[in-house]
Amino acid sequence: DGSLDQIIKKWTASSSSAVPTTSTAAGLKATPVKAKYIIASDSSFAPFVFQNSSNQYTGIDMELIKAIAKDQGFEIEITNPGFDAAISAVQAGQADGIIAGMSVTDARKATFDFSESYYTANTILGVKESSTIASYEDLKGKTVGVKNGTASQTFLTENQSKYGYKIKTFADGSSMYD
């Protein structure tokens, strides 16, 4: 019905090409098993989820899960413990699901059932504008910050010996920039 496109465009400068084509017909209803679901999410991963100036969680994921709940006729309780804790909450049965801009990996598929992807993103390396770092080779001997538990952390760990950098993990994205 175009809701996903509208949400993505509101929060990003991305075109519709960032929104994957799905095989599920829009508006197709399922019968909820429960009247209320506990959904865990990240606490700081803008534009997907972050706190606004009123300390309310907002962003793509927050709008999307609320739209899904409304469309499918169930209530949600959203918790924002952070990415690692959200994953742990679902694994421990403390939450029914997670919405957190999570990359789909083979390891995660072994543990979780995923919806169809709603956004296509790439792993990128960000540096200060004045930096001379232009490639992974330039990271030799440097320390690279990454959010714990992410696909980016997996990528960096898998390539650490190849490029010779150190890895420093952070519990949330905003801490990397402080």
Regions found by a protein language model. Name each.
Residues 1, 11, 26, 30-102:
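Extracytoplasmic small-molecule ligand-binding "clamshell" domains
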Residues 49-52, 65-74, 152-173:
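Ligand-binding cleft/hinge of the Venus flytrap
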Residues 84-88, 100-111, 155-160:
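A ligand-binding cleft/hinge motif common to bilobed small-molecule-binding domains
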Residues 1-11, 152-156:
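Periplasmic-binding protein-like
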Residues 18, 94, 106-121, 161-164:
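Ligand-binding "clamshell"
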Residues 68, 90-91, 139, 176-178:
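Hydrophobic residues within well-ordered alpha-helices
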